[in-house]
Amino acid sequence: GVLSHCKPGTIIVDMSSVAPGTTQKMAKIAAEHGVKYMDAPVSGGTIGAQKGTLTIMCGADEETFEKAKPVLEAIGKRIMRIGGTGMGDAMKIVNNMLLGANMASLAEALVLGAKLGLDNKTMYDVISTSSGNSYVVDAKMKKFIMPDKFEPGFAMDVQYKDLTLAQEAARGVKMPIPMSATCTAVYEQARAAGYG
């Protein structure tokens, strides 16, 4: 694979979202070949990458992070070393766990509001200036729901994968996460209905 083509001292920057344990195993294998391995999952989507505004959550030792950072600045505005190997992936799991719950909660709230007779504009005007506001309200409701124009940018299958990574991580530290488990079940139902 890739390692057979790497010279000692090469840094592999893995920008996928995987379990921290997987990253730590890959880093150990890379180290056996004299190669550094840094996890660097992102938030901000395709548009963020095109505009160079991604948030990049890095897991690596300080020296590796500092060497790789200038390359990441081409696509990222906020490039942070979260901790050692796997910690970027851990942060991404926590972030996407919260994102998934926020998106599911917003969808549920808007359907309830509509069934109670509220229109989208009124709900947006109130929620966006009240305690229910969030990134999801600002970014998703304004962009997709208000203009009644939905263009998918993040597949439900990917969100589901991220939620299952959170479930796996929680089991690993023996922590129940019942809200996330319920949210994961909602995404699983949607996938089963063909909305992957």
Feature locations, PLM:
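Active-site-proximal catalytic alpha-helix in oxidoreductases
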Residues: 51-59, 80, 84-116, 127-140, ...
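Rossmann-fold dinucleotide-binding core
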Residues: 8-12, 17-100
